[in-house]
Structures are given as C-alpha cells and as structure tokens.
C-alpha cells in the first residue's frame, strides 16, 4: 500500500501561513518531522510525497526534507516523489548527489519513475529496466541487459540498499507509484 | 565630539571601503553622524550598508547615530520608495525632510529594503519576490524561465546565511538597474548585509586550525565560498553557496562577499574586480552582493 502525503498541506501546517515555497532549514525540519509522524501512524511501506502544490524548493529545504528523510527512514520505508517540476528536480538531485543518496521520482502524467541523486551507472540502468519490465530476478536482468550474473546482482543489491526496488524472494519489484 | 562619516556621492560596492574607513576603530568611541547630503545615487548594497552600520552601533551600545538625508529630492524620493527611511528611522536620528514612501516602490525595485531576522522573514522575502522576479529576469534580462526559480533559491540561501550564521538580524534588497560603465547592460542585484559575527568568527571553531597562521577574514571567506565549508558538522551544510556559484557561472554573474577586513569575489569576464582584497577597513558582519546581467544574444 502507498500513503500519499501532500507536501503543500504539511508546509502550510508547519509555517501556519499560506506560503507555497519550501524554503529554510527550520521549515524543512518541521515538514520532515510531520512526515515521519504521519508514516509512524500508518501500516504502509511506501510513502508518495506529492509536491504538486509546491512552488519552490530551495537547497536547504531539499536537504532537510528529502535527504534527511532518506537517511532517517532508510530501513523502514520506500519513498517516491511525485508532482515535481524541473527546478524541484534540480535542487533535490543536487543535495542527494552530495550525500550519495537517490530517490525515485514520478514525472507528471507518467507512472515510469526516474532516479534523482547518485547511484552507480549500472544501478541506474537496472532501475530503468526493472521499472519498465516489472519484477525481475538476477537472471532476468542479466538476460535483458546482456550482463553477467555477478554484474546484475551487484546492481540490484545497490538498488536494494537505496530502497529503490522491493526484493521479495528471488524477485526485485519496482516501487509502486499509483 | 562627533565623528562625521560621509556617504560617497555614488555609493556602491566599489565606494564601500571609503565609507567603512570613515568609522576608524570599531566601534567608534564618538557619536557618529552619517552624512548623506551629497549622495547622488546608492545601490541596494550601499543602502543596506548604512543600515548595517546603524544596527552595529546599536548593538555595540553606542549613542544613536545621526543621519542627514540626501539634499536631492529625487534621491530622497528614490530612497523612500525603496523603503530605506522606514528602516533607518529605527536606527538613526534622521535629519532633513524625509518624503513619505509611496504605496509601491519603483518598478526596478524588486524587493524593498527588508529586514531578515528569522526564517519566517525568508519565507516573506521569497514570497514577495516571486512576481516581479519573472518580469525582470525573463522579460528584461532575457534569462530562461527557470532562472526565476533559481534566482529565488539563491535569494533564499543568501538570506538564510544571516539567520544561521550572523547571530543577529540583517537586511536584503533587490533591484534592477543598468551597469553603464562596467557592462553596458541591465543587471539584477541582490544585496544582503548583516551586522553579525562575520565569516571568520562563525567558522573559527571548526576550521581555523587547518589554516594555521593563514587564518583570518580572507581565509574564512575562501573556506566558505571556494571550499563550501560550514560551521555546522551536518554534512548537508555548505551547499547553498556552491549552488549559487554554479548558476552564476552559467549566467556570467558575479558574487562577492565582504566580511571584516576582506572581500572575495568570483569575477566574471566582463568585470575587472580582483578576486581577493585583504587588509581593507574593518566593517562589522558580512555583506554579500550577487549580480546577474542581462544575457547577450549569443548566450540565449
């Protein structure tokens, strides 16, 4: 199951004002705390953070909200972003690369996520393959990409560590996005 | 005794050191009179530098300084429309007739002189700038549409430096005007200034040791602007200035930071400034200026 969190709503609660800009570290920390509290009260394993009604995300807030959330919840939840505009991508990608983190982001009018942040090139290619093909095991990925089994396993292991695929048995599932 | 400090006739980042030198030993022991009667023009950097001086004197518990307003009605009206006198009245005993500020500032004032004391103020600044920024940056300076949001991000990060590092409040102002002599093009200028502890003291506990004898205002600016370090141990810190530099490089913009007795600039090809100036007259806190020029036809 997916739990959708509207970032605009959390922002308005955090700053008690009708602003649509996710800016400043204190605001980011307040929003992240609310996300964590919300997730702690659900049984869902995947959090879909919806940025549709956010105007601007600055670097400080991207760091406080997205990077620190990924660092905090790394062992508990899968996080997917949606409703991002190109400039949101830029800020979030910048801070995640700095931390060597990555997150899946669903572009508007699409269910195929793209990766923001840093993963090795093989892991990025494997992510695209799993997202497009659906659940794959190591052999399936090797076949689809023409890789050795060891190379495929390494790429899928990296995606697992970053919580960018869901391993179940021998299969690696794409993150749910709808 | 009163120390008279003349505001330069043309007051911007280039004439700033003359203004700073007027204060002598900081804080000056005498009562201060800031004399702007002969001033013909002031950039946003100049306007908020005057306020910073007033704030620093107040924080040093000195007698309230005097400020004689410009003689020129045109200059006075412009300063009033930029919101300068509203803020100055709290810090200075104003002498001379001050015009009432109009309901709205001139169209090239993107952001009035605005105090920044807490993160809520940064929200207000970013909210306020969003409409005018697009008109100026895209309409006049021919920057791509997404530049507006990058510009707002830069403004936000620059203002947050006050909240996070200065230990006191500061000021921000944003204005568009034409750099006739230096560039011959329209520019947008963000000016941010505070009367706080400055870069050297802010970074000292975490970074002075590795610089050894070199540590000072210049080394602290180099650590912050070139090496992107922060006083916080949080590994996510220090990215704001790095991002600002990246997009300024793309737009041939300029950033300069003055703190204490040093000034460090990332100098674009159109400017003849020196990257580092040291042993300057002391001035409290930190002053940041970001200049974004209109894009030439070839770089569109």
Predicted ranges, named:
Chain A
Residues 40-41, 130-134:
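Short helix-capping/hinge SLiMs at alpha-helix to coil transitions
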Residues 19-46, 51-101:
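Amphipathic alpha-helical interaction surfaces in cytosolic regulatory modules
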Residues 132-145:
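Short acidic, hydrophobic short linear motifs in intrinsically disordered regions
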Residues 98-129, 154:
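Short alpha-helical segments that sit at the start of domains
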Residues 146-161:
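Short amphipathic alpha-helical interaction segments
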Residues 1-24:
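Domain-start "cap" segments at the beginnings of catalytic or binding domains
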Residues 119-120, 167-178:
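Short, cationic-aromatic polyanion-contact patches
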